[in-house]
């Protein structure tokens, strides 16, 4: 009955879908991301509702958050928008992307991985070479 009411409200455009939610496996790895209701719509805790419905841990994520910065100037939410394969860190309340290379380090403020040395900023294109632990120029 409740789900039918929600569907009727959606079809009548009285209720808008705007929030995003990540579902986690038992190791806090993101296995799915959906679009859903805004927290508080109809007085419901949607994180809890979606989690119980699927039998998984569910965490809201912000499409506009990357590197602990909100694109529209709002408050950043959980450091980064969740993607499949990201890890949810409950101590930091953050989504962390997969580590791209063994030598890279986690920036605990942005929860993004950084190379041990900065990429040159000279207008050229580079790629990371893990064997030499250095940036290599892309020959075009």
Segments the model singles out, each with a brief description of its role:
Residues 1-140:
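Interaction-interface detector
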């Amino acid at each position: 009955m409740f789900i039918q009411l929600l569907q009727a409200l959606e079809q009548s455009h009285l209720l808008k879908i705007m929030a995003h939610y990540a579902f986690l496996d038992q190791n806090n790895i993101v296995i799915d991301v959906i679009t859903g209701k805004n927290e508080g719509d109809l007085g419901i805790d949607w994180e809890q509702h979606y989690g119980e419905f699927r039998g998984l841990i569910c965490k809201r994520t912000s499409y506009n958050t990357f590197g602990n910065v909100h694109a529209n100037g709002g408050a950043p939410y959980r450091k980064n928008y969740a993607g499949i394969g990201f890890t949810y860190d409950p101590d930091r309340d953050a989504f962390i992307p997969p580590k791209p290379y063994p030598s890279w380090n986690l920036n605990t403020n942005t929860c993004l991985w950084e190379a041990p040395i900065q990429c040159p900023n000279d207008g050229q294109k580079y790629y990371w070479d893990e064997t030499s632990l250095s940036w290599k120029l892309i020959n075009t």
